[in-house]
């Protein structure tokens, strides 16, 4: 079998590494769109012999199979705890491929009932030195009906029989008034439920006016109760912001338990500039303090960890947590898992470091299981066990 063009990350590091190492160069959004166009075509043609051969080579490079990394959570079998966060594959064009990149699960969206263009460009900015990004995308997507058609065209295996779990992240249409939000979410979810292993209620993006008001306990409860009345509802999780006060986090944990939610995803991007207030964007000449949008990546790491710890302390092990925000190494992944996250998601770190980040994390987790004498990754969740370094670490 010929080697994958992404073998050892050589392609990514040679061609994209120099582009991503500074804030200038190719537009960040255009780069993502170009990559997704190619991946979307590959997903539609993944049964073709040549495409299949390339994808199998890719899987050989990036997948790491180990029964110790498997978990069954809210009725879904996750082959490993590392997933692709929502926001990259907004329209689900590459849903049939993400397992080849080593992911145990992938989340498409955020999708809204009405297709919408999002906010004006430029709206996505690299902060290479800080390994971070600022975005104010505004839920740009083709809409729920288009997403269903896109997923059906890829002829995915039915839920429960896929090589990687598929989540669908649902948000509110910008044109929908806040008081009508439950019906807007319900329309999307009712249409997409047959295709989803799980669904996420996104009430935490900072880029849709008023959306974060839905994190208020009374508003969120009304929304959840409406969705749970659907004829067929997949396991529901809620994605929360890092900027919530601790009392609000506790309230969401209680609500999730009382309403029977499958879990909480923590966290979305932050309105806090996290010490980067005076960092100036080359594209606009303005500082981050002057710019709208949510911050992601390494600066978010500590707050994301604190939120996971708070949720774990509030809800205990009964509520599944998915950790996202600033995860760019096996050590950080282990820290998030031992703080209470059963699963983790990557986005900004994966963009900067490339596809090899997934196997590096998985190999690092395997080594930690060995060093701690654990039989499964589930035993590490919420354990508080430290990272044990060793000479053979996958991280070097």
Curated annotation (Swiss-Prot):
<feature type="binding site">
    <location>
        <begin position="135"/>
        <end position="139"/>
    </location>
    <ligand>
        <name>substrate</name>
    </ligand>
</feature>
<keyword id="KW-0560">Oxidoreductase</keyword>
<feature type="binding site">
    <location>
        <position position="239"/>
    </location>
    <ligand>
        <name>FMN</name>
    </ligand>
</feature>
<dbReference type="InterPro" id="IPR013785">
    <property type="entry name" value="Aldolase_TIM"/>
</dbReference>
<keyword id="KW-1003">Cell membrane</keyword>
<dbReference type="InterPro" id="IPR005720">
    <property type="entry name" value="Dihydroorotate_DH_cat"/>
</dbReference>
<comment type="pathway">
    <text>Pyrimidine metabolism; UMP biosynthesis via de novo pathway; orotate from (S)-dihydroorotate (quinone route): step 1/1.</text>
</comment>
<comment type="function">
    <text>Catalyzes the conversion of dihydroorotate to orotate with quinone as electron acceptor.</text>
</comment>
<feature type="binding site">
    <location>
        <position position="207"/>
    </location>
    <ligand>
        <name>substrate</name>
    </ligand>
</feature>
<protein>
    <recommendedName>
        <fullName>Dihydroorotate dehydrogenase (quinone)</fullName>
        <ecNumber>1.3.5.2</ecNumber>
    </recommendedName>
</protein>
<feature type="binding site">
    <location>
        <position position="110"/>
    </location>
    <ligand>
        <name>FMN</name>
    </ligand>
</feature>
<feature type="binding site">
    <location>
        <position position="297"/>
    </location>
    <ligand>
        <name>FMN</name>
    </ligand>
</feature>
<dbReference type="GO" id="GO:0044205">
    <property type="term" value="P:'de novo' UMP biosynthetic process"/>
</dbReference>
<comment type="similarity">
    <text>Belongs to the dihydroorotate dehydrogenase family. Type 2 subfamily.</text>
</comment>
<dbReference type="GO" id="GO:0005737">
    <property type="term" value="C:cytoplasm"/>
</dbReference>
<dbReference type="GO" id="GO:0006207">
    <property type="term" value="P:'de novo' pyrimidine nucleobase biosynthetic process"/>
</dbReference>
<keyword id="KW-0285">Flavoprotein</keyword>
<feature type="binding site">
    <location>
        <position position="326"/>
    </location>
    <ligand>
        <name>FMN</name>
    </ligand>
</feature>
<feature type="binding site">
    <location>
        <begin position="347"/>
        <end position="348"/>
    </location>
    <ligand>
        <name>FMN</name>
    </ligand>
</feature>
<dbReference type="GO" id="GO:0005886">
    <property type="term" value="C:plasma membrane"/>
</dbReference>
<keyword id="KW-0665">Pyrimidine biosynthesis</keyword>
<dbReference type="GO" id="GO:0106430">
    <property type="term" value="F:dihydroorotate dehydrogenase (quinone) activity"/>
</dbReference>
<feature type="binding site">
    <location>
        <position position="202"/>
    </location>
    <ligand>
        <name>substrate</name>
    </ligand>
</feature>
<keyword id="KW-0472">Membrane</keyword>
<keyword id="KW-0288">FMN</keyword>
<feature type="binding site">
    <location>
        <begin position="86"/>
        <end position="90"/>
    </location>
    <ligand>
        <name>FMN</name>
    </ligand>
</feature>
<feature type="binding site">
    <location>
        <position position="169"/>
    </location>
    <ligand>
        <name>FMN</name>
    </ligand>
</feature>
<feature type="binding site">
    <location>
        <position position="267"/>
    </location>
    <ligand>
        <name>FMN</name>
    </ligand>
</feature>
<dbReference type="InterPro" id="IPR001295">
    <property type="entry name" value="Dihydroorotate_DH_CS"/>
</dbReference>
<dbReference type="InterPro" id="IPR005719">
    <property type="entry name" value="Dihydroorotate_DH_2"/>
</dbReference>
<feature type="binding site">
    <location>
        <position position="202"/>
    </location>
    <ligand>
        <name>FMN</name>
    </ligand>
</feature>
<feature type="binding site">
    <location>
        <begin position="268"/>
        <end position="269"/>
    </location>
    <ligand>
        <name>substrate</name>
    </ligand>
</feature>
<feature type="active site" description="Nucleophile">
    <location>
        <position position="205"/>
    </location>
</feature>
<feature type="binding site">
    <location>
        <position position="90"/>
    </location>
    <ligand>
        <name>substrate</name>
    </ligand>
</feature>
<comment type="subunit">
    <text>Monomer.</text>
</comment>
<dbReference type="InterPro" id="IPR050074">
    <property type="entry name" value="DHO_dehydrogenase"/>
</dbReference>
<dbReference type="Pfam" id="PF01180">
    <property type="entry name" value="DHO_dh"/>
</dbReference>
């Amino acid at each position: 079998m010929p080697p994958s063009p992404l073998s050892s990350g050589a392609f990514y590091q040679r061609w994209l590494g120099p582009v991503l190492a500074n804030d200038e160069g190719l537009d960040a959004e255009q780069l993502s769109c170009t990559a997704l166009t190619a991946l979307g075509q590959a997903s539609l043609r993944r049964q073709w012999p040549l495409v299949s051969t390339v994808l199998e080579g890719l899987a050989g490079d990036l997948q790491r199979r180990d029964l110790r990394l498997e978990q069954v959570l809210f009725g879904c079998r996750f082959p490993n705890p590392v997933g692709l966060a929502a926001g990259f594959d907004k329209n689900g064009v590459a849903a049939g491929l993400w397992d080849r990149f080593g992911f145990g699960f992938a989340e498409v969206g955020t999708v809204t009932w009405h297709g919408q263009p999002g906010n004006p460009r430029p709206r996505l900015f690299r902060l290479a030195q800080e390994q971070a990004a600022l975005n104010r995308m505004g839920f740009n997507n083709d809409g729920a009906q288009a997403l269903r058609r896109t997923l059906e065209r890829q002829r995915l295996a039915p839920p429960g029989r896929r090589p990687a779990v598929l989540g669908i992240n649902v948000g509110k249409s910008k044109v929908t008034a806040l008081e009508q939000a439950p019906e807007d979410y319900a329309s999307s979810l009712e249409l997409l439920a047959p295709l989803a292993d799980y669904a996420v209620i996104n009430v935490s993006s900072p880029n849709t006016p008023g959306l974060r008001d839905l994190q208020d306990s009374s508003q969120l409860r009304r929304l959840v109760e409406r969705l749970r009345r659907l004829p067929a509802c997949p396991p529901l999780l809620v994605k929360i912001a890092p900027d919530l006060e601790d009392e609000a986090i506790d309230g969401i944990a209680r609500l999730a338990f009382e309403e029977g939610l499958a879990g909480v995803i923590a966290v979305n991007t932050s309105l806090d500039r996290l010490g980067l207030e005076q960092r100036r964007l080359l594209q606009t000449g303005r500082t981050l303090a002057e710019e709208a949008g949510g911050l992601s990546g390494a600066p978010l790491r500590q707050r994301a960890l604190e939120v996971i710890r708070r949720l774990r302390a509030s809800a205990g092990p009964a509520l599944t947590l998915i950790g996202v925000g600033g995860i760019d190494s096996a050590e950080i992944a282990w820290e998030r898992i031992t703080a209470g996250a059963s699963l983790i998601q990557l986005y900004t770190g994966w963009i900067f470091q490339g596809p090899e980040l997934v196997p590096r994390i998985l190999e690092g987790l395997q080594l930690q299981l060995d060093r701690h004498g654990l039989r499964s990754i589930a035993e590490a969740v919420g354990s508080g066990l430290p990272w044990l370094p060793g000479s053979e670490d996958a991280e070097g």
